[in-house]
Amino acid sequence: VFYPVARGKYFASIEGDDYWCDPHKLQLQVDFLESHPEYAACVHNTVIHTCGSAEPDRPYITALSGDRDVDFETVMLGMGKAYHTSSLMARRELMIDPPKFYYTAYSYGFGDQPRAVWFALNGGIRFIDRPMSVYRVRSNPQSWSSNLDRHYTQLKRFVQGELAMIDDLMPFLSGENVEIAKD
């Protein structure tokens, strides 16, 4: 993982054929994190574009409205869909030496949810209700979303990874967060 060798105060994520569609995205997120040092990360809404379909574009996040905090419960119950990867900007220092539960999940092939959990536990995540990136689905038959739709074994592995991650996560939790993780 690139975090230990990356330079700079923050990192922003983008994968594959997704793209940023707002020229002010990075500056807005840097400005937020600079003026709110208590937050670990800042995310925003994303547009879902289904390639090869007449289906209209739609927002990735529909359960949240307005700028708000993304808490631990939202991250856990969202199963990695509390925000889209292309929307993330976070403090690099938090990923220099991430906890074991991150590596456990990563070994199962996913890293978005454990990273979001870590940020939620270390200052929180701010959601900006403004679409600033585009997530293209079904544009690559080998994409994560296509594989989950087509392959039961991939889904089974995801669930196994989720359970293993939760086991490793428990030492970091207290109070109601323990119950949320168990649910």
Protein language model regions, located:
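Glycine-rich, basic loop-to-helix element that forms the pyrophosphate-binding segment
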Residues: 1-7, 28
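Short, high-confidence coil segments that cap the C-terminus of an alpha-helix
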Residues: 8, 36-39, 123
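Conserved nucleotide-sugar donor-binding catalytic segment
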Residues: 4, 44, 62-150
